[in-house]
Amino acid sequence: MTWRPVLARTAVLRHDRARGTDLLLLPERVVVLHGRAGGVLRLCDGSRAVPEIVAELSEAFPGAPVAAEVPEFLTALRKEGWLR
């Protein structure tokens, strides 16, 4: 997979300090991100391919099911139009 994910032009990733959570701001919609989703999306800057993102997260979180879950998560967000 040579796709280098990046947020859609209309999407903005923000951290809500009051709630202590990350938010994905979209036109007419706000998505509250849970767990490490915000951290994963911060790596989606267009400079890394999916395998590079997986490798970086696998190193940061040994034993976590990164290789199985992250590509699936990114693909789902791409289908929603939140990543390109």
Where are these regions (language model features)?
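Acidic, low-complexity/disordered tracts enriched in E/D and polar residues
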Residues: 1-42
